[in-house]
Curated annotation (Swiss-Prot):
Protein's GO biological process: DNA-templated transcription elongation; regulation of DNA-templated transcription elongation
Keyword annotations of the record: Coiled coil, DNA-binding, Transcription, Transcription regulation
Keyword Metal-binding: no
Family membership: Belongs to the GreA/GreB family.
Organism: Flavobacterium psychrophilum (strain ATCC 49511 / DSM 21280 / CIP 103535 / JIP02/86)
Name of the protein described by the UniProt record: Transcription elongation factor GreA
Function: Necessary for efficient RNA polymerase transcription elongation past template-encoded arresting sites. The arresting sites in DNA have the property of trapping a certain fraction of elongating RNA polymerases that pass through, resulting in locked ternary complexes. Cleavage of the nascent transcript by cleavage factors such as GreA or GreB allows the resumption of elongation from the new 3'terminus. GreA releases sequences of 2 to 3 nucleotides.
Residues forming coiled coils: 47-68
Matches recorded under InterPro entries: GreA/GreB_C_sf, TF_GreA/GreB_CS, Tscrpt_elong_fac_GreA, Tscrpt_elong_fac_GreA/B, Tscrpt_elong_fac_GreA/B_C, Tscrpt_elong_fac_GreA/B_fam, Tscrpt_elong_fac_GreA/B_N, Tscrpt_elong_fac_GreA/B_N_sf
Length: 158
């Protein structure tokens, strides 16, 4: 059973570009590697040929999985999102109630999460805890070492 995944325009383009890269460049390279290994002689004792065939099989599996993800991908219509609540694509500024530290996160789909750039998945513990919250609300988030309380200070969209 396939699962629908939601993407921003940027995330969907990145997925499509990666899929095209695999099909247009990696697939022909894998075929060329097999042909080169085949030309080296007896296939029954040719470890290079076996490795090339295995690599091709793994590549085809990856392509198939990515095609399935892409076919079930849906573009998020930002105009339909409620701007008063923390939802996917929201920029949320929060304050840790225990230490007063302020942080800003961009809530994104799981496939687009990148903590280095401040993008957290809506399926992460913090992302789940912030979903649906409004400015001024306290989000109680269960993490492995206890419960964190964050106050939502600001919600914006690009």
């Amino acid at each position: 059973m396939s699962t629908v995944s939601y993407y921003t325009a940027e995330g969907l383009k990145k997925l499509k570009d990666e899929l095209e890269q695999l099909k247009a460049i990696e697939r022909p390279k894998a075929s060329a590697d097999i042909a080169e290994a085949r030309d080296k002689g007896d296939l029954s004792e040719n470890a290079e040929y076996d490795a090339a065939k295995e690599a091709q099989g793994l590549l085809e599996l990856k392509i198939k999985k990515m095609e399935e993800v892409y076919s079930n991908a849906r573009l998020i219509d930002e105009s339909q999102l409620d701007v008063s609540k923390a939802l996917v694509l929201s920029h949320v500024k929060i304050k840790n109630q225990s230490n007063g530290m302020e942080m800003s996160y961009h809530l994104v789909a799981e496939s687009e999460a990148d903590l280095k750039t401040g993008k957290i998945s809506v399926t992460s513990p913090i992302g789940k805890g912030l979903l649906g919250k409004s400015v001024g609300e306290i989000a109680e988030i269960t993490v492995p070492n206890g419960i964190l309380k964050f106050e939502v200070l600001e919600i914006t969209r690009d």
